[in-house]
Amino acid sequence: MKEMYENAEDKVNNSTGKWSCVEERICHLQHENPCIEQQLDDVHQKEDHKEIVTNIQRGFIESGKKDLMLEEKNKKLMNECDHLKESLFQYEREKAERVVVVRQLQQEAADSLKKLTMLESPLEGISHYHINLDETQVPKKKLFQVESQFDDLMVEKEAVSSKCVNLAKENQVFQQKLLSMKKVQQECEKLEEDKKMLEEEILNLKTHMENSMVELSKLQEYKSELDERAMQAVEKLEEIHLQEQAQYKKQLEQLNKDIIQLH
């Protein structure tokens, strides 16, 4: 009888010890619960990171479109600038040609005036010779030659004067064109500045896109890590849950057996 009592008491003590182990295990699980909840929160945050990645990808597409637009605008400005440079070169060449023509006409005018001056004295003498023709006996042939030369010089002088007038008009037109070309040159310089600004903006966009690509790569890597950690956390939770279920079931069966034996 005493032996049966001692056996029953041992079984009760064993059951009490098993219950203590169960309570200790439950307490341990309660301590692990915050860590598991954090892992679950990471799983929920995964969707937020997906949205961030989507927004960044959308930003890449918009940046690419803007980059193409800036490149098209840059090409257009470069074509306009080349056209203006070609026009400016053409006007500069015409200016140089006109300068040569002006110098030639000025030289011709100077030569004509020089010849006219040289003939002024003989012409004065010619008038005197007309009055005293019989006394001086100047040959009529020489007089005719001098008068013919004088007429030729007058015609040449009129031609040079007409050329000078026309040249002055052309020079005025050219000055107006030159003024217009200065404005064109200023516009060309402004286009060059716009081109430089566009090139800087394109460079900044490319740098931004490169940095964004690095950031996207990091986000994708972080997303993969989160996915893996979330999967591991879920698997661990399922494994712990199955182990706890099996252990609890085993302990419950053992406890039922012990209670039956006590009775």
Swiss-Prot record:
This is Putative ankyrin repeat domain-containing protein 20A12 pseudogene. It comes from the Eukaryota. InterPro entries: Ankyrin_repeat_domain, CC144C-like_CC_dom. Pfam families: CCDC144C (PF14915). Residues 65-121, 171-263 form a coiled coil. Keywords: Coiled coil. Signal peptide: none annotated. PANTHER family: ANKYRIN REPEAT DOMAIN 36-RELATED (PTHR24147), ANKYRIN REPEAT DOMAIN-CONTAINING PROTEIN 20A1-RELATED (PTHR24147:SF1).
